[in-house]
Design a protein with these regions (language model features):
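Pyridoxal 5′-phosphate
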Residues: 1-201
Length: 202
């Protein structure tokens, strides 16, 4: 269920000798908390979860997952891919016990090519791109000031109208689903109205 932006780096790490555990999902696209608990070991470095699936809109229970991770191994970092959720689903990094969160500007009508990485305060991560000391030494290279400003405005607009947007999309989605499901041999994939924004049918 992971987006290639997360899945492919994990495959790369496997090629470099890291052990990656891949978990399956149930018929609605949810990862079993029990299966996840069994997969976390004393040497588990990172758990990564897509909060909202980019094809079905299925929502993973990020708060329950975060709680589980920290109970099983407080040293395991928790990354959440929030690209499809940001501005469309409430996110509380403290409540969800998130250490790292990523999002992309173009998914909230911001500029293309700009995104955000949230890092829990005090967390030290070795930079991937070396050079200057931009972004507090976490990523070298001159910042795209206009892109960052555009992302800030887009985020402000998204969060200001998020509650109303969620309710409006639910109404439109229900009308669409009712119409399509009235046709023979159709079914909803995923969680239906519980999913974010998307309607995925066959």
């Amino acid at each position: 269920i992971e987006h290639p932006a997360v899945k492919n780096p994990m495959k790369y790490l496997e090629e470099k000798g890291y052990e990656v555990t891949w978990l399956g999902v149930d018929e609605k696209g949810h990862i079993s908390l029990e299966e996840r608990a069994n997969a976390i070991r004393p040497d588990t470095i990172l758990v990564s979860t897509i909060l909202v699936n980019n094809e079905t809109g299925v929502i993973q229970d990020a708060a329950a997952i975060g709680k589980l991770i920290k109970e099983k191994n407080p040293n395991t970092l928790y990354h959440v891919d929030a690209v499809q959720a940001f501005g469309k689903y409430p996110i509380d990094v403290q409540k969800m016990k998130i250490d790292l969160l990523t999002m992309s500007g173009h998914k909230i009508h911001g500029p293309k090519g700009v995104g955000m990485l949230y890092m829990r305060k005090g967390l030290k991560v070795r930079p991937f791109i070396l050079g200057g000391g931009q972004q507090k030494g976490q990523r070298a290279g001159t910042e795209n000031g206009a892109g960052v400003a555009g992302l800030g405005v887009a985020a402000d607009v998204a969060f200001r109208s998020m509650k109303e947007s969620i309710e409006h999309v639910k109404e439109v989605k229900k009308t669409l689903m009712d119409g399509i499901l009235a046709m023979p041999d159709t079914q909803v994939n995923g969680d239906g109205l519980e999913a974010v924004s998307y309607t995925h049918l066959t």
